[in-house]
Amino acid sequence: MKHLIIVESPAKAKTIKNFLDKNYEVIASKGHVRDLSKFALGIKIDETGFTPNYVVDKDHKELVKQIIELSKKASITYIATDEDREGEAIGYHVACLIGGKLESYPRIVFHEITQNAILNALKTPRKIDMSKVNAQQARRFLDRIVGFKLSSLIASKITKGLSAGRVQSAALKLVIDKEREIKAFKPLTYFTLDAYFESHLEAQLISYKGNKLKAQELIDEKKAQEIKNELEKESYAISSIVKKSKKSPTPPPFMTSTLQQSASSLLGFSPTKTMSIAQKLYEGVATPQGVMGVITYMRTDSLNIAKEALEEARNKILKDYGKDYLPPKAKVYSSKNKNAQEAHEAIRPTSIILEPNALKDYLKPEELRLYTLIYKRFLASQMQDALFESQSVVVACEKGEFKASGRKLLFDGYYKILGNDDKDKLLPNLKENDPIKLEKLESNAHVTEPPARYSEASLIKVLESLGIGRPSTYAPTISLLQNRDYIKVEKKQISALESAFKVIEILEKHFEEIVDSKFSASLEEELDNIAQNKADYQQVLKDFYYPFMDKIEAGKKNIISQKVHEKTGQSCPKCGGELVKKNSRYGEFIACNNYPKCKYVKQTESANDEADQELCEKCGGEMVQKFSRNGAFLACNNYPECKNTKSLKNTPNAKETIEGVKCPECGGDIALKRSKKGSFYGCNNYPKCNFLSNHKPINKRCEKCHYLMSERIYRKKKAHECIKCKERVFLEEDNG
């Protein structure tokens, strides 16, 4: 009977299968096989604690059946999901669905997908780590509770479609704080006195009449001119010359956060793009040695390096660069994060033999660029430090001192691989006490610059330093803030949009802990403690939930609505009120601002406008198109006095059936249809099925609600948008 190995991704399964004989079957779970119910909180909360309602997604039902059948036939079923909390939880859920005792499923882990790594993992299985599973469940429960309860409240007070979250709101607060700094910034004009001496020596005034000048201290132009006039009359000599040797230490190998930062700064990749490419390099690509993973696991906060990899790197350095570039012993790095999972490794090439040049015919251009970045950084991390000589010269007169600084490279060390953009700034050969002639003295004005907005790289750096989130959350958090229209990223700068200010203002006033970086970091520490079996996850949830829910209930009563609706300049035909534009989950519509006293809704131009020609047969009112969760229908605009409704007639000229995309409501075909004012997409089983979309549906499911996605252009950018919940994912331009 074959042994069964269960991994997460099909690409990973395919690569591993190449390393094993016919006695092994490898199948992918394709991510989480079950999750909290999407149509409610999904968690039962009572005096006994927090009990999840896990549901197998319909897209996974057949796959789960297949896994169960294969497991029944297998003599051993190995759980080989990623060795992080998310991977541990996926393995746990798979084992639970198969059935039987958890102990009967050996858990194997590896940090690289190479034949040796897989074979070694099979020799050293362990049990599923329930502490890690509970840490993941606690994170999932916390995120669901905050997202479900707080997002509903925010949406009710501002506008639908907005959300709040445990990590995303803390990150958004950082962006808002930066915007406030920029807005509050007042430029300061200050002056420096810059001297030009003989021998091409340039220096700046650092003290006057025995008083050290602080940076930006000289703000009076008249005073600066007076000092200039006095110092121009003085005689000067070399007061001191100081030379020091300084090392530029080698940078450590990459972990997730630093890889995202460097890829953003040096390659122009977004964090999401970086992780997507890194995932492919980890799971397996074609190489001269066959299909294999060429980098180690890319979601890590560890800087550990395997002993064998260190030896490979040192041998490579000695062979290619010589003994001068090889330190006496291997360099060891440690993460600043005290809860870093040190069992993991830093991100490195799986084989130092696979130089970037050897892969140029195998990898796509963007894959090669990222691999080259990882390869060079790892090799450089094991080289000698670069060595500089720093120089400083002080030129003095009776009333003041000027200072000049320079440096020159003595030994390039790791710069041999990574390069060095800093040019030497050499000072002339001088001797102490020698006189030197002042050729020119200038008073130069400078204006302080406002704080720079965050880039994706710098925001990740701050999130990491504050302990907000973990390596796996940085990229999704920034992407989520973009998709929610809280931020925009232009020319590598992150700026906040109007809705972000409103949300943060509410959270700061009523839910300060959600946007408090210290609270967020402490919660991450609690999750780390759960993973290390130092804390009970049910107790952590209780400690958070009940105070949080008290604030939710208070918020419902105390938070003033900030909903703002655009005026149309038209009057309501029913009550004389003002018609305004509003938004619902189905899009924009025009209604009376006296709602709920007046429920008038004006029919706007839509894809299906048969209502424009139809009057209510009961009262003579206008039949307008409305939407329910079952689709579109006609209703009298005199509701609630008249409650007449009618199904829409099917548009006869259905055209252009979309290949490979089925109706999410009934499974029927979807086709392009036309009305007098435009085209739309509808189900061919109409009127039995009322599915309708203004944008072309595609064969892709929403990650949030698992409804059908559509493709559209939004603000001149291509995007995929959920037809139901309007979750939007922008398609990235090719930066390669």
From Swiss-Prot:
Keyword set includes Cell wall biogenesis/degradation: no
CDD domains (UniProt xref): TOP1Ac (cd00186), TOPRIM_TopoIA_TopoI (cd03363)
Enzyme Commission number(s) from the entry: 5.6.2.1
GO cellular component: chromosome
Active site per the UniProt annotation: 297
ZnF (C4-type) intervals: 572-598, 616-642, 663-689, 702-725
Cofactor(s) this protein cannot do without: Mg(2+)
Domain Topo IA-type catalytic: 129-552
Entry binding sites for Mg(2+): 8, 82
Catalytic activity from the UniProt record: ATP-independent breakage of single-stranded DNA, followed by passage and rejoining
Pfam families: Topoisom_bac (PF01131), Toprim (PF01751), Zn_ribbon_Top1 (PF01396)
Region (Interaction with DNA): 163-168
Alphabetized UniProt keyword annotations: DNA-binding, Isomerase, Magnesium, Metal-binding, Repeat, Topoisomerase, Zinc, Zinc-finger
Biological process, per Gene Ontology: DNA topological change
Every Toprim domain range: 2-113
UniProt site (Interaction with DNA): 32, 139-140, 143, 299, 484
Tree of life domain: Bacteria
Subunit structure comment from the entry: Monomer.
Function, as annotated: Releases the supercoiling and torsional tension of DNA, which is introduced during the DNA replication and transcription, by transiently cleaving and rejoining one strand of the DNA duplex. Introduces a single-strand break via transesterification at a target site in duplex DNA. The scissile phosphodiester is attacked by the catalytic tyrosine of the enzyme, resulting in the formation of a DNA-(5'-phosphotyrosyl)-enzyme intermediate and the expulsion of a 3'-OH DNA strand. The free DNA strand then undergoes passage around the unbroken strand, thus removing DNA supercoils.
PANTHER family per UniProt: DNA TOPOISOMERASE (PTHR42785:SF1), DNA TOPOISOMERASE, TYPE IA, CORE (PTHR42785)
Protein family according to the UniProt entry: Belongs to the type IA topoisomerase family.
Name by which UniProt lists this protein: DNA topoisomerase 1
Species per Swiss-Prot/TrEMBL record: Helicobacter pylori (strain ATCC 700392 / 26695)
Originating gene: topA
